[in-house]
Amino acid sequence: MGNPENIEDAYVAVIRPKNAASLNSREYRAKSYEILLHEVPIEGQKKKRKKVLLETKLQGNSEITQGISDYVVETTEPISPANQGIRGKRVVLMKTFPLEGEKVGREAALFIVPSVVKDNTKYTYTPGCPIFYCLQDIMRVCSESSTHFATLTARMLIALDKWLDERHTQSHFIPALFRPSPLERIKTNVINPAYATESGQAENSLHMGYSALEIKSKMLALEKADTCIYNPLFGSDLQYTNRVDKVVINPYFGLGAPDYSKIQIPKQEQWQRSRSSVTEDKERQWVDDFPLHRSACEGDSELLNRLLNERFSVNQLDSDHWAPIHYACWYGKVEATRILLEKGKCNPNLLNGQLSSPLHFAAGGGHAEIVQILLNHPEIDRHITDQQGRSPLNICEENKQNNWEEAAKLLKEAINKPYEKVRIYRMDGSYRSVELKHGNNTTVQQIMEGMRLSQETQQYFTIWICSENLSLQLKPYHKPLQHVRDWPEILAELTNLDPQRETPQLFLRRDVRLPLEVEKKIEDPLAILILFDEARYNLLKGFYTAPDAKLITLASLLLQIVYGNYESKKHKQGFLNEENLKSIVPITKLKSKAPHWTNRILHEYKNLSTSEGVSKEMHHLQRMFLQNCWEIPTYGAAFFTGQIFTKASPSNHKVIPVYVGVNIKGLHLLNMETKALLISLKYGCFMWQLGDADSCFQIHSMENKMSFIVHTKQAGLVVKLLVKLNGQLMPMERNS
């Protein structure tokens, strides 16, 4: 616990699991827990509030764990039924934290108090009293710079989240953490003479003594045993001996080490019985390890619904590499299949270890109703084939099981039905609807072929999946619709964003790997238009940081492209109002500089319109715009989000949210709020290293010997892209 003399403040994290099943999981999920937090007003801001952990002072002359336990009970009495308070299982010291400011040199301790599993008990809301919050919701918005939390509370919550993640990997730790305390287990044992009927019961109210029949009835009520068997010999004077069916003596015992050259493998009939017993053990183990698979196999809808509510995964493969939906389709369990697809959101094209799909199993078994359910699913791949290249129709006609004629008819009719479509947007807001011939199995490569672009143009672009604050380039073999389905999980893995506010869409965008030397040779007007739309979008959003003169030139080119040639009567001084400036000037310059640029923009616009040496054809103007953008350091970059820490004073650090841009030129950091370019490093002039758990990466500039660390969940993606793009460059390009 460190030096107790330095510890005054005790912070308490009261946590409870939402369900008992999560305690046995080796995978940590923050959404499986709730945490007790206070809300207090922010100083000087009456309406705004921040969340803090429970806090108390440690009394040097008292027993610490008992004091904290009593404090939790006292604090939670107003919100609990009958003012009983919340009595934790135990008090565990997690970590100590150094204090800052006036309390430098002292420490605060974070104690964890595990509570009972969440039940239907209604806790009343009382102003000024703590309430339970979902831990996942808290961690999504928790950072040391967040105004929603006290700084020390934020640090402690982040440490708690990491601590729980680590402890879930340790066998039996989490169940032991939430196990009733030894004193509670003794008091609630019915054979204890001082049996407590309720937890927290006062010692003077304990019932003293039970008869054997009363103990039996209590045990039946508490343990819910199917049968209760008395030992008839217990307490009697009868003599008894152990009865055995057979005694086998090892004839080789005591004869020394055997001659292994003479050992023979027994015949198969001699070990057949032993092998069958092993099979039985495996079957019993399968039932215990995969309850969702068993309920799907048996068509137990009630159990299936309950397990899905407890967040059992529909994608988990068992020891035979089958998912629950494979069993439901194999055994013809119609309702189980429907529940897994609708409630469990199971992928209808999920493959087992032998690359067979649910549709293969349903068709092979002649389960026409399940075939119909699968074919009606918008993401189904009607043309899916197994490891031997067989379609569901081939399997159906080979096996001829049950109602196979109806199943075959449905499969044949489905081939000619119109396909579902997906919208692929461009950066100007337009889109093309592309047929999904393989449902959610349709790959990026297949979608690109459906975009009706020439083979040459296709190589410059690819599909991106983007929401408001996260954009990812997909690879040719990726399946975009499955990424759309999994977007909440992807967001949770790579960001702290709220998935409810991030709606993913698919975009046709420039391939970040496209070399500038190749782009400069592009002549196709459609390719130039798509590149122009994306460059214009990034310019207006402030991602292209450049000198004022460059931004004014780009603005004049946009005026020529949008409004045509300059007309003195039409394009007067007042023409460039705030609304028109929005379409030609970066948002970061709109209020600070744009009003002072209007004369210079109009002047360049006029010169451009009257210049005879400049072609006024649209794709030539768009190419001129791109030529000016090529000189900007961040052109063509993929942007990630992160944080860097700078020293605001000797005692504390300032957190700066940043965009991390990676392109064919190098790495660039932009201030997230102002879009100011903080640093720009070319390949060959800096080194990088991925941090622990892919949570950060370190950059070292070889020119000015400067090093800094960027903290981001996207660190792994950033480093992979740096390695990829740096590897594309020739040594001469890297050093130029």
Swiss-Prot record:
Residues 420-734 form the FERM domain. ANK repeats lie at residues 287-316, 320-350, 354-384, 388-419. Residues 172-195 are annotated as: Interaction with ITGB1BP1. Its main location: cytoplasm. CDD domains: FERM_B-lobe (cd14473), FERM_C_CCM1 (cd13197). One of its GO terms (cellular component) is cytoplasm. Transmembrane segments: none annotated. Gene3D superfamilies: 1.20.80.10, Ankyrin repeat-containing domain (1.25.40.20), KRIT, N-terminal Nudix domain, NPxY motif-rich region (3.30.70.2240), Phosphatidylinositol 3-kinase Catalytic Subunit, Chain A, domain 1 (3.10.20.90), Pleckstrin-homology domain (PH domain)/Phosphotyrosine-binding domain (PTB) (2.30.29.30). The FERM domain mediates binding to RAP1A and RAP1B and is necessary for binding to phosphatidylinositol 4,5-bisphosphate (PIP2). The N-terminal domain has structural similarity to the nudix hydrolase domain, despite the absence of a nudix box and low sequence similarity with nudix hydrolase domains. The N-terminus and the C-terminus part associate together via the NPAY binding motif and adopt a lose conformation that is disrupted by ITGB1BP1, but not by RAP1A. Component of the CCM signaling pathway which is a crucial regulator of heart and vessel formation and integrity. Negative regulator of angiogenesis. Inhibits endothelial proliferation, apoptosis, migration, lumen formation and sprouting angiogenesis in primary endothelial cells. Promotes AKT phosphorylation in a NOTCH-dependent and independent manner, and inhibits ERK1/2 phosphorylation indirectly through activation of the DELTA-NOTCH cascade. Found in a complex, at least composed of ITGB1BP1, KRIT1 and RAP1A. Interacts (via C-terminus FERM domain) with RAP1A (active GTP-bound form preferentially); the interaction does not induce the opening conformation of KRIT1. Interacts (via N-terminus NPXY motif) with ITGB1BP1; the interaction induces the opening conformation of KRIT1 and competes with ITGB1 for ITGB1BP1 interaction. Associates (via N-terminus and C-terminus regions) with microtubules; the interaction is inhibited in presence of ITGB1BP1 and active GTP-bound RAP1A. Interacts (via FERM domain) with RAP1B. Interacts with CDH5. This is Krev interaction trapped protein 1. The lineage of its organism: Eukaryota, Metazoa, Chordata, Craniata, Vertebrata.
